[in-house]
Amino acid sequence: MIRYILICLILGTLLLSCDVRRKDKVADDAMQKMEQVLKDTTTVELIDTVYKFGTITEGDKVEYNFRFKNTGKKPLVISNAHASCGCTVPEKPEKPVMPGETSFIKVVFNSKGKSGHQEKSIFVSSNARPSFPDLTLLGEVKRLAQ
């Protein structure tokens, strides 16, 4: 019986030590991936993050260019831009924005079927660190007289 317990303890110790090595390898792999991501990142400075379009009439469209500058040393790649509502359509630059260059994300808000206070958010995915801030359109839509 003692022999059986001793064998179980030895096997348990071996299994636990293998698991520690596995966790170390996983941690090392994660660290390498993080270092690679950080090598490929850049920084961005937003010239404007909020646009207040005032009061418009239902059915009007608002178009605005949110401007930004790549302040890092690597090209800024915007992989995705999407809005909180289908009535708002962002258009991102198709080409990378080189260091020192200024560019914009064009946003069009269609007020058809909308009324009252409007707050639309635009979310941008890029290789910027810290991440690209959310963009916001604010305003009022007056309902058409029926």
Where are these regions (language model features)?
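Positively charged n-region of N-terminal signal peptides that target proteins for export
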Residues: 1-4
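C-terminal motif of bacterial Sec signal peptides marking the signal peptidase cleavage site
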Residues: 14-17
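Short, low-complexity, disordered segments immediately C-terminal to signal peptides
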Residues: 19-35
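Post-signal-peptide N-terminal segment of Sec-exported extracytoplasmic proteins
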Residues: 36-77, 125-138, 143
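Short strand-edge motifs at loop-to-beta-strand transitions and within beta-strands
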Residues: 51, 101-107
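Surface-exposed binding patches on compact interaction domains or structured appendages
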Residues: 73-101
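Short, surface-exposed loop/turn segments at beta-strand-coil junctions that are enriched for proline
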Residues: 110-115
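A short beta-strand micro-motif common to beta-rich folds, especially ectodomain repeats
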Residues: 118-126
